[in-house]
Design a protein with these regions (language model features):
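Bacterial N-terminal signal peptides
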Residues: 2-9
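Structural recognition of the beta-strand scaffold that forms the well-ordered cores
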Residues: 36-37, 111-112, 134-136, 172, ...
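Mature N-terminal segment immediately following signal peptide/propeptide cleavage
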Residues: 31-42
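Active-site microenvironments of metalloenzymes and redox enzymes
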Residues: 51-155, 197, 253-255
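N-terminal low-complexity, Pro/Thr/Ser-rich intrinsically disordered segments
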Residues: 16-27
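Short, well-ordered junction/capping motifs at the entry into regular secondary structure
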Residues: 160-187
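Disulfide-stabilized, aromatic/cysteine-rich ligand-recognition loop
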Residues: 14-17, 115, 177-179, 196-255
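Active-site rim elements
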Residues: 55, 106-109, 173-174, 178, ...
């Protein structure tokens, strides 16, 4: 199914123009999400300027509405699932307990997935849509989150869900104002997977569990064993972070 291109009328206060966007529909489902065009420019890597090409990036974190289709095989008919006629290595096992931790589901950010899960979701999404979806690099993520500004938000609570205002849970995506390039929740809510030059992943931006000094464009966390401390499996799950409810992601689409 070909995505429908639209120009969004919703954008950050102070933005000069509404962002160029397209709506990506998931074939054979009602699920959809919006991507925004990010202009080419320069980002920072190890203190040095590096070029960033123009690309599309999710306006919000990936929500359960979309993630469920892949993670819980809702695009497969029951007979296919029962007979095991699918690549089980490319789909998650069931998590222990509620995947959404009881925070909320429809319209809420998917959370608690490993970087491997996020990568394989992007592969599935690419196959479903005939586009090239992937995780952003750390440079791309920060460049898009900053949206042309070097300064941190004047009032963090106006744009981010974090320790002081989140009530120890995630919130539906898109409830805070977007940045100048039309992106919501780049800071707070869930910290977002992004790739380092060596191919490993970190989470960026801070999350609902973090206090103000840990939420920002340069905030990074490296995966740690504590993120799976209560996982009863040996070895630990390749799919889920039993103690990482603060981890989510958004996707990038290359032209």
């Amino acid at each position: 199914m070909i995505a429908t291109f639209i120009i969004s009328a919703v954008y950050a206060s102070g933005a000069v123009n509404a962002p160029e966007t397209f709506e990506q529909k998931i074939p054979n489902s009602l699920a959809k999400f919006e991507m925004a065009r990010i202009p080419a420019g320069e980002g920072k890597q190890d203190g040095k300027s590096v070029p960033v090409k123009s690309l599309w990036i999710g306006r919000t974190e990936v929500t359960w509405d979309v993630y469920d289709i892949w993670a819980f095989r809702r695009d497969l008919d029951q007979d296919t699932v029962n007979r095991g006629h699918f690549d089980a290595n490319a789909r998650p096992s069931r998590p222990y307990g509620a995947a959404d931790r009881g925070f909320g589901h429809a319209g809420y950010p998917a959370l608690g997935m490993t970087a491997r899960s996020a990568d394989l979701f992007c592969k599935w999404l690419s196959e479903k849509t005939s586009k090239k979806y992937r995780l952003p690099t750390v440079v791309e993520w920060e460049y898009a989150a900053r949206a042309g500004t070097a300064a941190p938000p004047a009032k963090l609570g106006d744009v981010a869900w974090y320790w002081d205002n989140a009530d120890d849970k995630t919130w539906p995506v898109g409830k805070k104002p977007a940045n100048a390039w039309g992106l919501f929740d780049t800071l707070g809510n869930t910290a977002e997977w992004a790739k380092l030059p060596d191919g490993n992943a970190v989470v960026c931006g801070g999350s609902f569990i973090d206090k103000a000094p840990e939420v920002g464009f340069g905030a990074r966390k490296t995966p740690a064993p504590a993120w799976q401390q209560r996982d009863p499996q040996r070895p630990k799950s390749r799919w889920w972070l039993s103690d990482g409810p603060f981890v989510g992601f958004r996707v990038v689409c290359d032209d």
